[in-house]
Amino acid sequence: MGNLLGGVSFREPTTVEDCDSTWQTDSEPEPEQPGPAGGGEGQEQDEREQPEQPPERAGGRPRASPVPEDHAEAAGAEQGGDSTEGNAKPKRSFYAARDLYKYRHQYPNFKDIRYQNDLSNLRFYKNKIPFKPDGVYIEEVLNKWKGDYEKLEHNHTYIQWLFPLREQGLNFYAKELTTYEIEEFKKTKEAIRRFLLAYKMMLEFFGIKLIDKTGNVARAVNWQERFQHLNESQHNYLRITRILKSLGELGYESFKSPLVKFILHEALVENTIPNIKQSALEYFVYTIRDRRERRKLLRFAQKHYTPSENFIWGPPKKEQPERSKAQKTPTLPALGSNGQTSTHKKSKDSKNSSAASHLNNKTVEEKKVASREPGEETDKPSPEASSEDTKPRNSEDDNAADQSESPPKKTVNDSAGKGECPTTSSEKDGEGENQSKDSENPENTSCHAEVVSQQNVTNPQTSSG
């Protein structure tokens, strides 16, 4: 009974987050080829993030849980609580998360508890033995029970035989599947044919019909009556969970997503079976081993779930800001700072060059004024300066001149004539901005040169030394 593998201990998950790896990564792995019976073996197996935990060798009964998965009083209370919740925000069930975690991980650390020749489930599906305790063969169930909704509703011992699992259910006469039995079952066409007929029978009981060999489903003819019954008989949600698990065990993993998508659509979009939405999101979705398929279904559900703020099965909120930060911080701040640095460097270089230019011009001008006799050129405007003033200048030079003349003017010598070039207060104060503007104006340089040449002409004493 549930013998542990020698020397290996399985660490039980302790939180819902430990059990659920659906949103651990957004990378979508490449799809793989489906298994031989259209399902589970070829698809991406769920949650390989814990390689140190070996998969179960075969499907023995899981370690004793507080309550068996199929127990109506325990699991039914969780799966059937939708109608009483109203608008209250739902909560994730640790019991459900742990149970489905073990299922998706092939029941780790447990060995087969039966001999390989004890193929009770396969022999039942080969019509060799009846299911216990009722003593009914599979052919009678498929032929006489089909459409008898009262019998299918009130009998609680057949479902474990029709959809066997590697875990104990409510009917203790039913035998758990083993790994060897699963492989033999898939090889037996007779068993597979009857298994699909049993699946169709139960779908019709729920008001659903299988429409093709890929697992797509649609509403049955009597869907309105059966949906109303399904919405009110919440113990059938346990049966749907078991059916989904069994599909995955016996090679029809690919049949799960179409059925779950259909149920989510009817519950959230059409509102025909609203009471099932909690079980669909908490149980049905998480029977699917492929993370990609789970993400697709949960995104669809989130789009239609109301109120949207009560949807608790999406990606964790703490991961979203981290991704947005990583996307927003490539190189923009670095470029901005580099741009500012280069601008400052350019302005500093221009200020330094303009300051040096003005110092040289100022030194020449002071020497010139010092050598000049007081009042000598008071009434003699420079012809060169006059001719220079008469030349047309472009608008840029005018703007530069206006800006340089905007502060109050101060001449070096109060007796200087109109022909002398004005020296602004910015030249005396040495402010960088106006100095850089003056250094860029070619008129100031030419004006100083003209004054020097004029001084040499009008003051022969100075020129002669």
From Swiss-Prot:
Keywords: Receptor. GO terms for molecular function: opioid growth factor receptor activity. The keyword Transport does not apply. Residues 48-59, 316-325, 363-396, 426-440 have a biased composition (Basic and acidic residues). It comes from the Eukaryota. Residues 1-89, 309-465 are annotated as: Disordered. It holds the Pfam family OGFr_N. The keyword Ribonucleoprotein does not apply. GO terms for cellular component: membrane. Belongs to the opioid growth factor receptor family. This is Opioid growth factor receptor-like protein 1. The lineage of its organism: Eukaryota, Metazoa, Chordata, Craniata, Vertebrata.
